[in-house]
Curated annotation (Swiss-Prot):
One of its GO terms (biological process) is hydrogen sulfide biosynthetic process. Its EC number is 2.7.1.25. HAMAP family: Adenylyl_sulf_kinase. This is Adenylyl-sulfate kinase. It is an enzyme of class 2 (transferase). Pfam families: APS_kinase. The active site is at S109. NCBIfam families: apsK (TIGR00455), PRK03846.1 (NF003013). Keywords: ATP-binding, Kinase, Nucleotide-binding, Phosphoprotein, Transferase.
Length: 202
């Protein structure tokens, strides 16, 4: 069978990341929130997106609600699928970042290996790891979805913080304890490190 030689690489004709960042007047970056369930990751992510939007900056939030029901709806919560879940999230995030979009991810991502994998895929220079360090006792007290109660009763297996471990990041760009900091304080601290990273200096 004759080999098809009619497929040619088109990367030399594609617009570059720089072209897109110049159009958007911003730099793409990954803001990766990690922490226990109920620590405040998604709440802070949403508030941060609103503040960046007010400043004319384009963002995209990725979290369990829009990932597990979409691109990763065929994955279980087995160890292998949890790793694949994060791998896919990182690959999708890289596409957004290469388009100049500020990408905000809020996932438990419970160990250093899995987060380091995400950072390698995205690229360490574009990866800001934010540890929402709210203590387990406070997360369990909030328990908005009743997940901790179910985990304590043994109804949920391998639940991070109860029956499965959580490894705190070794060198996060920022640590936020929402049992101490208000939402406004948390977002202000984030803006201090995020705005210099996403601003283009012409």
């Amino acid at each position: 069978m004759e080999e098809n030689n009619n497929i040619y690489p088109i990367f030399d004709r594609m617009l570059t990341r720089q072209d897109k960042e110049e159009l958007l007047k911003q730099r793409g970056v990954m803001i990766w929130f990690t922490g226990l369930s109920g620590s405040g990751k998604s709440t802070i992510a949403i508030a941060l997106e609103r503040e960046l939007h007010k400043r004319g900056l384009l963002c995209r939030i990725l979290d369990g609600d829009n990932i597990r029901t979409g691109i990763n709806n065929n994955l279980s919560f087995s160890e292998t699928d949890r790793v694949e879940n994060i791998r896919r999230i990182a690959e999708v995030s890289k596409l957004f970042i290469d388009t100049g979009i500020i990408t905000i991810a809020a996932f438990i991502s419970p160990n250093n290996d899995i987060r380091e994998m995400a950072a390698r895929i995205v690229g360490p220079d574009d990866f800001l790891e934010i540890f929402v360090s709210t203590p387990l006792a406070e997360c369990e007290k909030r328990d908005v979805k009743g997940l901790y109660a179910k985990a304590r009763r043994g109804e949920i297996k391998n639940f991070t913080g109860i029956s499965a471990p959580f490894e705190a990041p070794e060198h996060p760009a920022l640590s936020l304890d929402t049992s101490v900091l208000s939402l406004e304080e948390s977002v202000n601290r984030l803006l201090e490190i995020v705005l210099p990273r996403v601003s283009r200096h012409e």
